Design a protein with these regions (language model features):
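Active-site rim helix/loop that mediates acceptor-substrate recognition in acyltransferases
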Residues: 63-81
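Short secondary-structure junctions and interdomain/linker hinges
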Residues: 56, 60-63, 78, 138, ...
């Protein structure tokens, strides 16, 4: 089913979910320990990513179902545009982070918008410090995410700044009631 988002002001019909954007300036130097490493996904990671995604979906009420080609596209990288990183913890694959890069104000300000974060570990603090370090190395000025899925596990801890509301809709679809942001797995960009 086709989804669409409206930011800041809701439409005059029922939305599926009201979410909120949060941002974090990466100019803070956070010191991760060496247990987490972020590496670009490769074709050898695709089976792991698909299994992790399929296992994780059962915890959510709203998520896309990808065919093989869509999954490969979503979880591959085009440096500077979108990237998919494998989260390594002590040398073992523990998750995936997929994001897009938005260049703002004539390429003077770069923003990472998290599309999907799946993590099998428990140390979200060190993981986020590693994500921040990755952003600083890539000259990304801010991290932007919705309060969906696993993102809430670091939004509060690192004092992300709340932004505007965004509303998720589906074409020709109506539900009674709405979903909570924690019921949504994927940032439908």
């Amino acid at each position: 089913m086709p989804f669409f988002k409206i930011e800041q002001k809701r439409l005059p019909f029922n939305h599926i979910c009201r979410m909120k954007f949060y941002s974090y300036a990466t100019n803070n130097t956070l010191s991760p320990n060496s247990s987490h490493v972020l590496k670009h996904s490769t074709s050898t990671d695709m089976v792991y990513i698909k299994q992790l995604y399929n296992t994780s979906c059962s915890r959510y009420k709203c998520y896309p179902i990808f065919d093989e080609y869509q999954s490969i596209y979503i979880h591959s990288s085009k440096p500077g545009v979108y990237e998919s990183l494998i989260i390594m913890e002590n040398g073992i694959r523990k998750g995936v982070l997929t994001y897009v890069v938005n260049d703002m104000m004539n390429y003077k300000y770069r923003v990472m918008e998290i599309v999907l974060l799946l993590y099998e570990g428990t140390d979200y603090t060190d993981l986020f410090k590693q994500i921040n370090k990755h952003c600083r190395a890539k000259k990304i000025d801010a991290i932007l995410c919705l309060n969906i899925g696993e993102n809430n596990k670091f939004i509060k801890k690192f004092n992300f700044v709340p932004g505007f509301d965004t509303y998720l809709y589906m074409y020709n679809y109506h539900i009674n009631g709405t979903l909570r942001p924690s019921d949504i797995l994927f940032n439908f960009i």
